[in-house]
Amino acid sequence: MVREIVHDPMFLQRKSEDATQADLQTAQDLLDTLRANFDRCVGMAANMIGVAKRIIAINDNGKYLVMFNPEIISKFGEFETEEGCLSLDGERKTVRYKTIKVKYFNENFKQIKRSFSDFTAQIIQHEIDHCNGNCPRSEERRVGKECRSR
């Protein structure tokens, strides 16, 4: 089911709880919502649809991938970039890594460790930030600021 996008920074700044197999429907709703917004969005976290669970979905060059409880276990190749977000207006500067290794569970709750690079790595980092409650303020453009201070 396609869900409405959450824009409330107070909700988005809350750290999400670990997902369980009971959250499979939320993952499907997240995927449906991502697909419905394919023209303006390449990734989403569950809190963007109002569910504070550690679930992300990404569009990796036309192939959709859902991750439960994703965690970056290694990273290298730091760079600065600007990113937009479906939940927030405008673009913000941020620091990302060119290559990351992520530990996550798939839809069968089998643990996976996989490396990602370039734009796909950037998408995953952005969505994991959502899971961690890292939400840049729309009016703040400096690197490292979050909406926690609101």
What is each of the regions a protein language model found here?
Residues 1-142:
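Positively charged
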Residues 140, 144-150:
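Positively charged, low-complexity/disordered segments
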